[in-house]
């Protein structure tokens, strides 16, 4: 039976008890409205720890002024059932006062330079500062040995890894594989915003990522790969924030042309269809 905890002292007592027994503890941070991708992270964490804590907290500091904080779906009962089925031991449900005891205006910010300042960092200024700030607080609250994050948010995972390395958090960071719908659309809590007309079009993102991979392998120059991807998405109705072919650390390759022998790459896309913003990526 999953334990639901809303009091920080109770959470710390639970985790302290586990650690006194020599048990390893994992954390899976979420914002709720969970789906199979989230549950796969719980199952991944279970492979590296004896106990798994998942947090559900819709973090106001990572939403921009024109973003969807107010309408972000909250489904606590369904989340709890799904987490229990996935093997989660405890559900941590902090409120805003617990997470930000001095208020969000006085919250000590954390910024991960470089990796936070490109791609999503340009499109959503301050977003990753909010992510780092809340994740650092969750790390301090739960004191996990392991934490799992999804690779669908590729840049977020890179930001978290940099923060953990720089601030010497004694936490192993796991990256969970992207879980997809049958047509290739990456699972996301925001997919439910898609209209009936937009839903089939959304699967084109995955197809364009595969085209980017194949073009790179064929030696097409990087800028041409990105331009063709943008054109393909716009042709079916997307408004494109970016298409990018990057090194795994998200820096731009210094070779003007693609070079498959030069090492791994990651293709990343952020685009809007209707009122819904979707992100996805492909490592190769």
From Swiss-Prot:
Record-annotated active site: 38 (proton donor)
Subcellular location, record wording: Cytoplasm
Keywords associated with the record: ATP-binding, Cytoplasm, Ligase, Nucleotide-binding, Pantothenate biosynthesis
A single cellular component GO annotation: cytosol
Residue numbers binding ATP: 31-38, 150-153, 179, 187-190
EC number(s) on file: 6.3.2.1
Binding, beta-alanine: 62
Catalytic activity: (R)-pantoate + beta-alanine + ATP = (R)-pantothenate + AMP + diphosphate + H(+)
GO biological process: pantothenate biosynthetic process
SUPFAM superfamilies assigned to the protein according to its UniProt record, in alphabetical order: Nucleotidylyl transferase
Pathway of action: Cofactor biosynthesis; (R)-pantothenate biosynthesis; (R)-pantothenate from (R)-pantoate and beta-alanine: step 1/1
Molecular function terms from GO: ATP binding; pantoate-beta-alanine ligase activity
Annotated positions binding (R)-pantoate: 62, 156
Role summary: Catalyzes the condensation of pantoate with beta-alanine in an ATP-dependent reaction via a pantoyl-adenylate intermediate.
PANTHER family named in the record: CYTIDYLATE KINASE/PANTOATE-BETA-ALANINE LIGASE (PTHR21299), PANTOATE--BETA-ALANINE LIGASE (PTHR21299:SF1)
Misc note: The reaction proceeds by a bi uni uni bi ping pong mechanism.
Description of how the protein assembles with itself and partners: Homodimer.
Family: Belongs to the pantothenate synthetase family.
Protein name as it appears in the record: Pantothenate synthetase
Taxonomic lineage from the root: Bacteria, Pseudomonadati, Pseudomonadota, Gammaproteobacteria, Lysobacterales
Protein's gene: panC
């Amino acid at each position: 039976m999953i334990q639901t905890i809303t009091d920080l002292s109770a959470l710390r007592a639970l985790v302290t008890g586990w650690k006194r027994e020599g048990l390893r503890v994992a954390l899976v941070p979420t914002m709720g409205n969970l789906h199979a991708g989230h549950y796969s992270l719980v199952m991944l964490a279970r492979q590296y720890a004896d106990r798994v804590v998942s947090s559900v907290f819709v973090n106001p500091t990572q939403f921009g002024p024109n973003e969807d904080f107010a309408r972000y779906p909250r489904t606590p009962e369904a989340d709890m059932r799904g987490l229990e089925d996935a093997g989660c031991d405890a559900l941590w449900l902090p409120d805003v006062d617990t997470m930000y005891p001095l208020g969000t205006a006085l919250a000590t910010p954390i910024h991960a330079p470089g990796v936070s300042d490109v791609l999503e960092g340009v499109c959503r200024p301050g977003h990753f500062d909010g992510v780092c700030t809340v994740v650092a607080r969750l790390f301090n609250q739960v004191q996990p040995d392991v934490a799992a994050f999804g690779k669908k948010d590729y840049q977020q995972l890179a930001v978290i890894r940099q923060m953990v390395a720089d601030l010497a958090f004694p936490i192993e960071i796991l990256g969970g594989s992207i879980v997809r719908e049958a047509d290739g659309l990456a699972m996301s809590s925001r997919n439910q915003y898609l209209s009936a007309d937009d839903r089939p079009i959304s699967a084109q993102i995955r197809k364009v990522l595969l085209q980017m991979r194949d073009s790179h392998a064929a030696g097409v120059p990087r800028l041409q790969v990105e331009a063709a991807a943008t054109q393909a998405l716009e042709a079916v109705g997307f408004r494109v924030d970016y298409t990018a072919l990057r090194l795994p650390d998200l820096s731009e390759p210094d070779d003007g042309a693609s070079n498959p022998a030069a090492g791994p790459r990651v293709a990343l896309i952020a685009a809007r269809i209707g009122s819904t913003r979707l992100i996805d990526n492909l490592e190769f």
